[in-house]
Amino acid sequence: MARIALVHAGAVSIPPIELAFRQLWPEAQIMNLLDDSLFLDRGAGALPPAMTERFVTLGRYAAASGADGILFTCSAFGPCIEACAADLAPIPVLKPNEAMIAEACSTGGRIGLLATFAGTLTTMPAEFPTGSDLKPVLIKGAFEALQRGDMKTHDDLVLAAAESLVDCDVFALAQFSLSRVAALLFERFGKPVYSTPTSAVRSLRRATLGPG
């Protein structure tokens, strides 16, 4: 049985990724590591230099705990996760959004990227392949609504923001916490919706167990 470490910078990421594992890889043994000080220290600007070492430390702890694969669920820390992956090779270490990006880009169309945390949009657009037709949108107030448990306001703000992306061919949801609106987006707009948890679980399963 594969043991998978899920590393979180916020508790809101835990329910959607655990649901994705139950649906797509129920036999995996998952362990959760939560350090919400990462989110508190992230801010909306550039990543603080000391942040990378903190991620490497978390990754090494997960590896020492017997993890066969590691998935970071925090989308605003791409360079830190890349450094951790290099440090722990050959253990598979995945960013939360890399599989979703590959799937969304495979369509060849214009991608509407929805995010609720400003820090995500300082790093994530650069992770898309050069030449990608990308239209990012920050949904102000939605993440704060989610944190206080106001799911309806969160969902309504996301759906309203998506109206500005009607010229896009697909929607890409930048954060795990946005996966809760995937079905609502498809129902309203009829466009493909790429969600980070499901894409990440499929990719990590292949990386850990091989194809099949």
Model regions and ranges:
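Non-catalytic structural scaffold of enzyme domains
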Residues: M1-G212
